[in-house]
Design a protein with these regions (language model features):
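Active-site beta-to-alpha loop of glycosyltransferases that engages the nucleotide-sugar donor
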Residues: 2-21, 36
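Active-site-proximal specificity loops/subdomain of glycosyltransferases
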Residues: 4, 18, 40, 44-85
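A short acidic, amphipathic alpha-helical/loop segment
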Residues: 18-22, 44, 96-98
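Short, acidic, metal-binding catalytic loop of nucleotide-sugar glycosyltransferases
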Residues: 21-29
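Receiver (REC) domain switch/active-site residues of two-component response regulators
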Residues: 28, 50, 88
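Short beta-strand/loop segment that forms part of the nucleotide-sugar
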Residues: 28-36, 56-57
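Active-site acidic Asp-centered loop
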Residues: 35, 85-87
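Catalytic-site signature of metal-activated, phosphate-bearing donor transferases
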Residues: 64-73, 91-260
């Protein structure tokens, strides 16, 4: 059954090489929704994944509910397995469970944290071969809720406009998970070098007034000092070395990544 990745992005030239080089091994096709990028993002996509579709968003900015509505509309035209991820998320694990049985998989996250900022990263190697610290969804409920599940499905799924018992909205984050054979490696706080700080700081320019008034996307309204404080006081103290856990998913990925 065909597998399609959706992703909305704005000026993500720093993270895109890792995101694209990983997912092109897994998905038959990708639909990249461009929120009017002014950097090399589109050029990078065309270079690494030349057969993928690039759509210019109908939305002028990152208004959370209209993002989800646009994703809903695009997904409704796609058959087979589909998932919408941010550029900071990488799906990895046992892809053999993506069979023809109709189902919705709620995929949890491993929250990666840059505890060793002195170790430089390179874009010609996967991030999972360079950074190994963070915290696991399975360790406790707080860790799971820090980055809730994504929906990977081959049945119709509607992203709600407001939060429900099942889903935190807007944003498409689900409040439970039903598999640990697949996970997303979440790199929103790793690496936190100059490129990592720059991408987090530029997102706030795309948060509209209506979302600010509704207290949506408030975590994007920030500065470098606040980001550094959160990294050092909120995330690093909770982190541990996850090399063993990451190797499990990476080895499974390497064994199965050609199963499309």
């Amino acid at each position: 059954m065909k597998k399609t990745l959706l992703c909305h992005f704005y000026n993500e030239e720093y993270m895109l090489p890792w995101f694209l080089n990983h997912h092109k091994q897994i998905f038959d096709h990708g639909v990249m929704i461009d929120y009017h990028s002014t950097d090399r993002s589109v050029e990078i996509i065309k270079s690494i994944c030349p057969t993928w579709t690039i759509i210019t968003s109908r939305n002028p900015d990152f208004q959370a509910d209209t993002i989800d509505t646009e994703v809903n509309d695009i997904e409704s035209q796609i058959d087979g397995w589909k998932i919408c991820l941010n550029v900071t998320e990488q799906l990895i694990g046992d892809y053999s469970i993506l069979n023809d049985e109709p189902k919705q998989l709620l995929v949890p996250s491993i929250f990666m944290v840059d505890c060793d900022r002195e170790r430089n990263v390179t874009q010609d190697r996967p991030l999972y071969e360079q950074k190994f610290d963070g915290f696991m969804f399975s360790d406790n409920q707080q860790n799971f809720l820090e980055r809730r599940s994504r929906s990977l499905h081959n049945v119709p799924v509607h992203y709600p406009a407001n939060s429900t018992h099942e889903c935190m909205a807007p944003g498409r984050h689900w409040n439970t998970y039903n598999t640990d054979q697949l996970v997303t490696l979440y790199y929103g706080w790793c690496p936190m070098d100059d490129g990592g700080f720059a991408r987090k700081l530029q997102i706030q320019t795309q948060i509209p007034l209506i979302d600010r008034q509704l207290n949506r996307g408030f975590h994007h309204i920030t500065n470098k000092e606040t980001l550094t404080y959160r990294l050092e006081n909120e995330f690093i103290p909770r982190s541990r070395n996850l090399l063993k856990e990451i190797e499990f998913y990476v080895n499974t990925h390497k064994n199965l990544s050609n199963i499309l």
